[in-house]
Design a protein with these regions (language model features):
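C-terminal catalytic subdomain
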Residues: 348, 352-492, 498
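A glycine-rich phosphate-binding loop feature that marks nucleotide/adenosyl-phosphate handling sites
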Residues: 35-39, 159-164, 172-179, 234-242, ...
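ATP/Mg2+-dependent ligation/transfer catalytic cores
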Residues: 1-228, 262-276, 421-422, 427, ...
Length: 632
């Protein structure tokens, strides 16, 4: 049995190198060009490796053609102009995706597919998520070099000049949280909730099949040179159940897997591949993986913290973190760091629709589950001690003894957020803040004061009637009314979030700077997101709610020693069920009203009704648990 190859690095993307590698590895039998559409979906196809080798020069130069109407490029590639090209990216890592259920006859190794991250091109323009992030990265680097030339005193404070710069490196990192469970089995909500409150699972030892798969995944990440850093149990889940033969029969655990940072575009590519690898490994062992933001109502959801960094590489080989101050014990951040942080916070209204773009994502972003809903940051109580505030949107990660580790942590994304667009929009927002604060010429103390401004105070860059910094737990320290006043009222539905593009046109220009995003791309994203929102709301969420409500049946009768409390609770349940799902000749229920509003294109009304539905569904779930627990 020969040795498997897991990646092909950019330095080996020459035609002769690729041919040699493929001929030496007959287990690699297919090639797939992975373009990523505006919805964050990776394309996958199976091109026989013999055909790829035969036509390699043309395929690498011109790509392959496909029907763009089958991917999410609404408003760009439609039925009348559907042709798109998928063009290989020659400057990134290519992965070999192995099928461990199908083995090559020649050498006994698993059959592999060479996955080549690619760009989607329509009418000569790159229109995919990968291309947007690539443009954002180049725009950030080019604009920062221009600022270095414009403000020589800035680079002087770091100990270099713009002529000394070899490269501006944007580094990012993500992680994945997931629920792993036995298929077709579910755990009792109260059991899960109690285990979470008691922290019975957090960082506990994994056992059985879950341990085996987790260790296999970490080993495989090493093989792919993805530099895994940690895997552990998260707060959700319950203890495994074992049958009389010692076999685990019921699994319901929440896990987290972390790996090392990389260049921004490579970071997003890595995440897609790692997510697929994790799914394959658990499914191969008979377990289901849930990456949804909120797989189970009422217990911990899955977040995906996105880390954002920037550094310069000098021609002498030295690396300097641009967000770290020259004296870590005298200041929290550098001028560039303050500007970048304020840029995200000020422009988050147009970043948020990209970060939180699904009904599922909004199910997670609620008070009480360590999920951020307020546009606010925390610097820490003092320069020497880092902030540990987990209630904020943007965390500042810093270590006084390690300036290179300074970065920002955006805490709102989830595993199904489009990481390419999240990174692109975040770096565009950061660039706006950097440009504005450098132009204002603020001192370090003035920058800290600007970020720490109080509600009603005029800001040089930040808005007057907002606050942006809190060292308190914003959920414990403030009421909902106070949070809405200080940090702005958070959107509660996909439609409310998307509406921010229209109400914040000046901030939308921040995304378009350098033609990173265009009107065409933003409109395509909006159209795609609205379609998914309304189709899921009408076709899945309402249907699932109806199925759930039908399980809420009367349990008491006179023979069961029913009390007046049972009668009252049941009457409340019937009232809510009727309000939600039962029409009469003269009155429509909430579910019907939502469907009618969606069909009529009245999305404002549908969004308001969705909020009512969510509130009443939460109320009736809790009420039925109380009612059921009081029955003999």
């Amino acid at each position: 049995m020969g040795k498997m190859i897991y990646t092909i690095k950019p330095e080996h993307h020459g035609i002769e190198d690729i041919k040699k590698i493929l001929e030496e590895h007959p287990e690699i039998q297919f090639v797939s060009f992975m373009g990523v559409d505006i919805g964050g979906n990776g394309t996958d196809e199976k091109i026989p490796v013999k055909l790829f080798i035969k036509d390699m020069e043309d395929m690498l130069k011109y790509g392959i053609q496909t029907d763009g109407s089958s991917v999410e490029l609404q408003g760009i590639a439609d039925l009348s102009d559907a042709k798109v090209d998928i063009l290989p990216d020659m400057d990134c890592v290519w992965f070999v995706d192995y099928n461990y259920e199908y083995y090559n006859d020649d050498n006994g190794l698993p059959v592999g597919t060479l996955k080549i991250p690619s760009f989607i091109i329509h009418s000569g323009k790159q229109v995919c998520s990968r291309s947007i992030l690539k443009r954002a990265s180049l725009n950030f680097q080019n604009e920062l070099m221009s600022l270095f030339k414009k403000y020589p005193e800035l680079t002087k404070s770091y100990g270099f000049s713009h002529d000394d710069v070899s490269e501006i490196a944007l580094t990012s990192a993500t992680e994945l949280e997931m629920w792993v469970k036995t298929p077709e089995q579910s755990a009792d909500f109260e059991e899960l909730h109690t285990s979470q409150v008691l922290k019975e699972q957090y960082w506990k030892r994994t056992m059985g099949t879950v341990r085996t798969v987790l260790e296999k995944i970490m080993t495989q990440l090493e093989c792919y040179d993805l530099k895994p850093e940690m895997a552990h149990k998260e707060v959700g889940g319950i203890a495994n159940r074992i049958d009389s033969k010692g076999r685990i029969t019921h699994v319901m655990e929440q896990l987290e897997i972390d790996w090392r940072f990389s260049e921004t575009l490579q970071t997003a590519d890595n995440e897609i591949f790692i997510r697929e690898l994790i799914e394959d490994q658990f499914r191969h062992h008979g377990l289901e993986v849930l990456f949804k933001a909120k797989p189970i109502e009422g217990v911990a959801g899955n977040g995906e913290h996105v880390h954002l960094g920037a550094a310069v590489k000098l021609k002498n080989g030295k690396r300097i973190n641009l967000f770290a101050p020259t004296d870590m014990k005298a200041q929290y951040l550098s001028e560039i760091g303050y500007g970048a942080l304020m840029g995200i916070l000020k422009n988050y209204e147009v970043v948020n629709p990209i970060v939180t773009a699904t009904n599922d994502a909004f199910n997670r972003l609620k008070p009480g589950f360590e999920a951020p809903i307020c546009t606010v940051t925390s610097l820490g109580g003092s320069k020497e001690s880092p902030s540990r505030n987990r209630s904020v949107l943007v965390g500042v990660i810093r270590d006084a003894n390690s300036p290179l580790a300074t970065r920002f942590e955006l805490r709102a994304p989830n595993p199904y957020s489009n990481t390419y667009l999240v990174l692109a929009s975040s770096y565009q927002a950061m660039l706006d803040g950097i440009d504005k604060v450098l132009d204002a010429g603020l001192t370090m103390d003035e920058l800290e004061k600007e970020l720490s401004k109080k509600y009603g105070e005029e800001g040089v860059y930040l808005e007057k009637f907002r606050e942006y910094r809190s060292e308190e737990d914003v959920f414990e320290h403030y009421t909902e009314e106070e949070r809405n006043k200080l940090y702005g009222k958070a959107p509660a539905t996909v439609w409310e979030n998307l509406s921010a593009f229209e109400t914040n046109e000046m901030k939308q220009l921040v995304l378009k700077k350098g033609e990173v995003f265009t009107d065409e791309l933003i409109n395509s994203f909006k159209e795609s997101t609205v379609q998914k929102w309304k189709n899921e709301l009408a076709g899945r969420i309402i249907h699932d709610n109806i199925m759930l409500l039908k399980t809420f049946v009367k349990l008491h009768n006179e023979q069961d020693h029913a009390t007046d409390l049972d009668v009252v609770n049941w009457e409340k349940i019937v009232y809510l069920k009727t309000k939600l799902m039962k029409d009469s000749m003269t009155k429509k229920c909430i579910f019907t009203k939502i469907k009618n509003a969606l069909n009529e294109g009245d999305f404002d009304t549908a969004s308001d009704l969705q909020k009512q539905m969510n509130e009443k569904m939460t109320e009736i779930r809790g009420l039925y648990i109380q009612y059921k627990n009081n029955i003999f």
